[in-house]
Design a protein with these regions (language model features):
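A broadly used, surface-exposed interaction patch
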Residues: 33-70, 76
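N-terminal ordered "arm"
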Residues: 1-39
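A short linear-motif detector with a strong N-terminal bias
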Residues: 2-6, 56-61, 166-167
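Internal, well-folded beta-alpha domain core
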Residues: 69-252
């Protein structure tokens, strides 16, 4: 959910009249939504009257609904957002959250919002205490591709298919686990244009630019926040002395 989290931070920044400069996503829990098909979990859109139109039925059986190519879940997470302004009102942010949505989903509950100075990132993370930070692991993908002498797509699919023992043996890292793929953004497939029928206009624009795009998928790792904070204080191991590298930043 990194891209969704970044867009959520972008939304909050616009509402606050400032800019976001990075996010840290801490995963706590997830409940996948879907159904069972032939004994296997299917993360398809749940069927309901609100999702049904004449085009939603199977082309082969006019009485059968086709599965929708979407997946959804309930999420519990913590989000650390770096804003360019140091004057952020927790009260104003609370009011914004009450009327906001995350990735199109309803925000059912959130805890007290706290603000910290830029040099207090460790304090902010210690307040969260537990969970799993999301790390960029494109280094694993590059190393796997180079050692196997295969193309990037082959390396991507093979790396994700490795079991934990094989993964740790290949990279000689006994702590390596919880590798996954996620959407990191989008790349345009064509030039932007506002000359297209059916474009949903932005709230503050008469003409909104539009372009078809493809997702950019990357390798990430879920890593224990508690372990990061523990290593942060170890003098002999400087891997996590700089907590700023947990920040995900985006470019347009």
């Amino acid at each position: 959910p990194l891209f969704a989290a970044n867009m959520f931070a972008h939304h909050l920044a616009r509402q606050l009249g400032t800019q976001e400069e990075g996010i840290i996503y801490i995963h706590h829990d997830q409940q996948r939504l879907g159904g069972q098909a032939y004994g296997r979990f299917t993360p398809a859109q749940r069927r309901g009257a609100v999702f049904i139109g004449k085009k939603d039925y199977s082309s082969k059986n006019k009485y059968a609904l086709s599965l929708q190519p979407t997946a959804s879940c309930h999420l519990e997470f913590s989000l650390v957002i770096k804003f360019s302004s140091s004057r952020i009102s927790p009260e104003k942010l609370t009011n914004i959250l009450k009327r906001s949505r995350f990735a199109g989903g309803q925000i059912i509950e959130f805890l007290e919002i706290t603000t910290h100075a830029e040099n207090e990132l460790e304090t902010a993370l210690k307040k969260i205490k537990t969970g799993f930070a999301i790390l960029d692991r494109q280094d694993l993908l590059i190393e796997y591709q180079q050692r196997k002498q295969i193309n990037r797509v082959q390396a991507f699919t093979q790396l994700l298919a490795l079991k934990t023992d094989a993964l740790r043996a290949f990279f000689n890292d006994q702590n390596l686990s919880w590798i996954s793929a996620t959407n990191l953004g989008y790349a345009l497939l064509e030039p932007l244009t506002d000359q297209r029928a059916g474009i949903r206009q932005a709230q503050d624009q008469e003409n909104t630019a539009h372009a078809y795009a493809e997702p950019l998928t990357g390798i990430i790792q879920y890593f224990s926040l508690g372990e990061i904070l523990r290593r942060n204080t170890e003098a002999e191991d400087d891997t996590w002395h700089n907590l700023q590298k947990l920040l995900w930043t985006y470019h347009w």
